[in-house]
């Protein structure tokens, strides 16, 4: 698949923002305007004799070189299938754990100065004893909720940063596991065609299927982690 991890993150975040009446393209345009303004100021500094500016050597995200993602390695599955499966799984995750998930995001009390620390704390706890597909779904859902919370609290500037943090973590920490466990093809096999919702309607044991090793107790643990100030 030719889609990058960043494109997958943006699609999911854009979808979550749209559910709350927000528009990703508007946020992206604002971010680009801020970037252009900063670049102009930096170029002015160069023209005024500053030796500190250097053109970027390559594509980086938050200082980390972007490697080939598992989406690029596994080219059989269609990008649209992965995106739709991830959207559906995220919706089902949030439906099942709406209260715990709402408590989690509301307890963050994020600010531009503390957002990364909060993101890192929750994500590290989520994957502290391993990776599985359910936790990857939870990771995307958390990042999407954090973006929505940022916009709701008039901190729109954080959305682009959160997307970059998610992309970096997905590329650096989750891609190896994804590649070793069937790639995104396997994810689509498990979660495609709104499989999570169908299992719930069929009264299957949803917890064991979606959040293997990351059950409700694990979600609540994240909430208790954030309540320890």
Curated annotation (Swiss-Prot):
Write the record's keywords in alphabetical order, separated by commas.
Apoptosis, Cytoplasm, Cytoplasmic vesicle, Cytoskeleton, Membrane, Mitochondrion, Nucleus, Synapse, Transmembrane, Transmembrane helix
- Where does motif BH2 map? 176-191
**Which subcellular locations apply to this protein?**
Mitochondrion membrane; Nucleus membrane; Mitochondrion matrix; Cytoplasm, Cytoskeleton, Microtubule organizing center, Centrosome
Q: Which domain of life does the UniProt lineage start with?
A: Eukaryota
Q: How does it sit in the membrane?
A: Single-pass membrane protein
Residues that span the membrane, as ranges: 206-223
Motif interval(s): BH3: 82-96
Q: What is its main location?
A: mitochondrion
BH1 (motif): residue ranges: 125-144
| Single GO molecular function | BH3 domain binding
User: In which tissues or organs does this protein occur?
Assistant: Highest expression in organs with lymphoid development.
Give the CDD domains listed for this entry.
Answer: Bcl-2_like
Where do we find the motif BH4 here? 4-24
Task: Cite a GO CC annotation.
Answer: endoplasmic reticulum
- Report the PROSITE patterns cross-referenced here: BCL2_FAMILY, BH1, BH2, BH3, BH4_1, BH4_2
Biological process terms in GO annotation = apoptotic process in bone marrow cell; cellular response to alkaloid; cellular response to amino acid stimulus; cellular response to gamma radiation; defense response to virus; dendritic cell apoptotic process; dendritic cell proliferation; ectopic germ cell programmed cell death
Domain annotation text?
The BH4 motif seems to be involved in the anti-apoptotic function. Intact BH1 and BH2 motifs are required for anti-apoptotic activity.
What family does the entry list?
Belongs to the Bcl-2 family.
This molecule's function is given as: Dominant regulator of apoptotic cell death. The long form displays cell death repressor activity, whereas the short isoform promotes apoptosis. Also acts as a regulator of G2 checkpoint and progression to cytokinesis during mitosis.
Q: Report the protein name in the record.
A: Bcl-2-like protein 1
- The organism is Gallus gallus (Chicken)
Q: What is the lineage of its organism?
A: Eukaryota, Metazoa, Chordata, Craniata, Vertebrata
């Amino acid at each position: 698949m030719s889609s990058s991890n960043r494109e997958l993150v943006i699609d999911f975040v854009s979808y979550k923002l749209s559910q709350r009446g927000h528009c990703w393209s508007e946020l992206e345009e604002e971010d680009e305007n801020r970037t252009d303004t900063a670049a102009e100021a930096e170029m002015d500094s160069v023209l005024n004799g500053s030796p500190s500016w250097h053109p970027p050597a390559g594509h980086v995200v938050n200082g980390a070189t972007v490697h080939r993602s598992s989406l690029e390695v596994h080219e059989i599955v269609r990008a649209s299938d992965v995106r739709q499966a991830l959207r559906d799984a995220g919706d089902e995750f949030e439906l099942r754990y709406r209260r715990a998930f709402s408590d989690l995001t509301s307890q963050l009390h994020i600010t531009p100065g503390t957002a990364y620390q909060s993101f890192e704390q929750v994500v590290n706890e989520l994957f502290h004893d391993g990776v599985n597909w359910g936790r990857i779904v939870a990771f995307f859902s958390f990042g999407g909720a954090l973006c929505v919370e940022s916009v709701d609290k008039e901190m729109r500037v954080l959305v682009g940063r959160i997307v970059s943090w998610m992309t970096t973590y997905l590329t650096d920490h989750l891609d190896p596991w994804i590649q070793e466990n069937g790639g995104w093809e396997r994810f689509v096999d498990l979660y495609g065609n709104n499989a999570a919702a169908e299992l719930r309607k069929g009264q299957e044991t949803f917890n064991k299927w979606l959040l293997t090793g990351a059950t409700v107790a694990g979600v609540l643990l994240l909430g208790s982690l954030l309540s320890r100030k």
